[in-house]
Amino acid sequence: MRQTSSSSQRGGSRSGQGSRRRRSSKKGGVYTFYSRLVAGCALAVVALLWVSAASVHVHPDGLGILAWMGLMFPAFLAGVVCMLVFTLLLCRQRVWIPIVGLLGCCLTIRQYVPVNLPSPAPKQSLKLMSFNVMGYNPKEKDADGRTSMLRYLSRSGADIICAQEAALSVKLWKESHGDPFVRTLPYCDTVQIVGPGGSNGLTVFSRFPIVGKRKLCSSATNGAALFKILIGKGDTLNVINCHFESNHLSAEERSAYREMVHQPGRQELKEGEREHLSIVRKFSQSAVERARQADSVASYVARHPDRSFVVCGDFNDTPVSYSRHRIAQVLDDAYEQTGNGIGRSFNRDAIYVRIDHLFVSPEWRVFSCRIDRSSGQLSDHYPITCHIKRHAALPE
């Protein structure tokens, strides 16, 4: 009787152990599947982030989709950060994947969202400003007839202002806007991109004499122009004012873009597909034109290493783009050196990005580059400003 009871106990014990092993094996299998799934998702998001970061090295002509990849960089970056938090909390053995992903494109992250110590402007530095003035916002008139835009410019304290969408003849400027503005920035010149009477000129206001100008490149509506500014005896600063190709989105397409970003499921399928395809097509075509314009500007700078340059303007491209990267190959990005944060410069629609940029030759030291939001809603852009002071001699 005792033997039977003992045998039963041993059998029950073996049965219980087998059941526990099966349950443990089942749990292990589920965890392994879960871990591999997390790893796969993390690797996919990291791959997208890296492709987006690398897209700046490829000319968009023939590969327009890569321009879109660059535009999506912040979304992919957010995805990798989310995977980092997720793996830290629930799957720590896979946390190395998003960490490696972030380290692998840390330079691109710095270009997009730089973090720098404060750099107050020293005495005898030059203040530069680049501003897409949207035709000077003529609907906003002051009591004396001057636009609020021109009042803002005259009070900005800038020594040199590069304005885009700023067609304005010197004669009209002096006659219409009074002595105070002329005393502040007594020199002004414009290069027309569209043609006589067009509203998309490139204008420079300066405290120093403008001794020359020429068009560097242009399309039907956009381009870049060189202005030679005499900042001292025998010291010429070559300022290239850029307004690279716009995306030419209609009001309906801009609305569709907002829907794509905020509420992608709200539109009817066929209508949404048509609008989205139109946006993709226009963006891809304009990205190619911007790349060509950036190539022209960068090539001109590279051909004249003995000259001092400032290149600035409305690039219509984010920091992760071929056009911005092309200029950064020959000049220093002022915002990356001394700016902080995303630096949103376009203040309409769903676009929370920096598309206005400012570059200087290596002999200039940059101070306090920032996006000036005090301009309010005078334009659909905020201006980008910085101070510069020469700290090295030009190469012979």
Regions found by a protein language model. Name each.
Residues 125-137, 236-245, 273-283:
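Active-site-proximal beta-strand elements of phosphoester/diester hydrolases
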Residues 131-133, 166, 244, 314-315, ...:
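Active-site metal-binding loops of divalent metal-dependent hydrolases
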Residues 75, 103-125, 140-141, 150-151, ...:
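Structured beta-strand-rich core segments of catalytic domains in phosphoester-bond hydrolases
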Residues 3-14, 31-88, 96-100, 212-215, ...:
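Metal-dependent phosphoester-hydrolase catalytic domains
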Residues 144-145, 219, 282-296:
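Soluble or luminal CAZymes and related metallo-dependent hydrolases
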Residues 156:
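Active-site charged/polar residues at nucleotide-handling catalytic sites that mediate phosphoryl
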Residues 254-282:
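A solvent-exposed, charged loop/short amphipathic helix patch at secondary-structure junctions
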Residues 128-129, 162, 311:
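Residue-level marker for buried hydrophobic side chains located in beta-strands
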